[in-house]
Amino acid sequence: MFGVLFSCSSQEQQEDGPYYLSFADTEALYDFYSYREGAAPIVQGHRGTRENGLPENSIAALEYVLQQMPAVFEIDPRLTKDSVIIVFHDATLDRTTNGTGKVIDHTWEELQQLNLKNKNGEVTEHKIPTLAEVFEWAKGKTALLLDKKDVPLKMIADIIREHDANNYVVSLVRSPEDAAFYFNDEPKRMFAISFREPEAFQPYLELGIPTHQIFACIGTSISEKTDEINEMMRGYGIRSLISAAPTYDKLETEEERAEAYRKVIESGISIIESDYPVEMGNAIRNKKH
């Protein structure tokens, strides 16, 4: 499973990990994400991971995954009251911290007093990170997909530029308007484009974004529709992503989840996202025949 990850980027690792991915420039990032026949799948951790008692969207969660296998990550930038960009999914603090109320009603100084909770609701030692901290941690280790929450696009574009992170950060877009903003701001940007109908891809092509700067987020489960879209994307040399987080991750047993993950890969999908990336990565590496 790991061959494509290592062949498309430079690597720094010990015999048993960590499994770091380093992209020298944007061309290396494009090559990593490009579709090629027989390419092994890319594992993407959704908000890092929820495994090993670790809280989502924490630096510790990201690092844990890379100790086990190479992976990339989807994370969630969100604004504080005083306009600090943090990495945090929910609009409220209650589910994933020992705080309460809306994130936007708290300053960064106030949020630093809180601790993150894991998936079982247990308070951990880990703190909410800023996006700047995650950028600095990720450099030379992995690639980051930035979801869209409440941060203005210009602020996201500016912080990517400030940290010289264009060669390891991917912008997720759900509209041609957002894609146009990011592309005009930085023509070398890597995009993850989310759409569910084949005809919805055409407006992005009309923007002039090179297809080698795109991968496609096409759903949360496999179907005849995703098969159709994935086949179309392959024709452009574009990988397609399925997110198992809201679907297959919810299956009751590890065996059921493993079988579902394998079916996603067997359908031809070449990026798969999960709340449990280590479990998923091991499942698709150890295919049953």
Task: Go through the PLM ranges and name each one.
Residues M1-L5:
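Bacterial N-terminal signal peptides
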Residues C8-H289:
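Phosphate-group recognition and catalysis centered on beta-loop-alpha active-site segments
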